[in-house]
Regions:
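Structural recognition of alpha->loop->beta junctions
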Residues: 112-127
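Short alpha-helix immediately C-terminal to the canonical SAM-binding loop
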Residues: 107, 163
Length: 163
């Protein structure tokens, strides 16, 4: 058995909620996708606060910040089967860890708003470190914090490029 299972959050525990909202809300979103991704990249590197992220994405989408927040919250559906499985793994002594690209304030808000704060033994966020997956340094940092070797953990992500 592994000593730790390391999960991405968005796309694994719940959809990539802001992207899903953007696709549903913005007409001809493909023409604005590169700009959206550039905003997300700055946020993932910790160079953009969540408030500024919301302002920029709302402006790009042509909606109010309030509509953006409400829309994104409506996209947040937690994978409860995965949560139950993680609780089982923790009960068996396996550390449950989150490594995700995103800001501290936003990711922890989603985690805590959905009662998942105690699920994770460790949460590592790209915005805190300025290191974005798939950069190996974010995984090395996580393993060091856990005090384990790479062979003692498995990583689960919705994007193959990150594994």
């Amino acid at each position: 058995m592994y000593k730790a299972v390391i999960f991405d959050f968005f796309g694994v525990f719940c959809p990539d909620i802001t992207l899903e909202w953007f696709k549903k809300t913005v007409q001809e979103y493909e023409s604005k996708l590169a700009d959206f991704q550039e905003i997300c990249t700055r946020s993932d590197y910790g160079k953009l606060s969540r408030a500024d992220f919301n302002k920029e994405v709302a402006a790009l989408a042509g909606v109010s910040v309030g509509d953006l927040i409400a829309g994104v919250e409506s996209e947040t559906v937690i994978n409860n089967s995965l949560v139950a499985y993680c609780k089982k793994l923790r009960a068996e002594g396996c550390a449950i860890t989150c490594v995700s690209n995103g800001t501290h304030e936003w990711t922890l808000q989603v985690i805590n708003d959905h009662g998942l704060g105690r699920l994770f033994d460790l949460v590592v966020l790209s915005g805190d470190l300025g290191i974005v997956k798939p950069n190996p340094e974010i995984y090395k940092y996580t393993l060091k914090k856990l005090g384990i070797k790479p062979s003692e953990a498995v990583f689960v992500d919705d994007r193959e490029v990150n594994t």
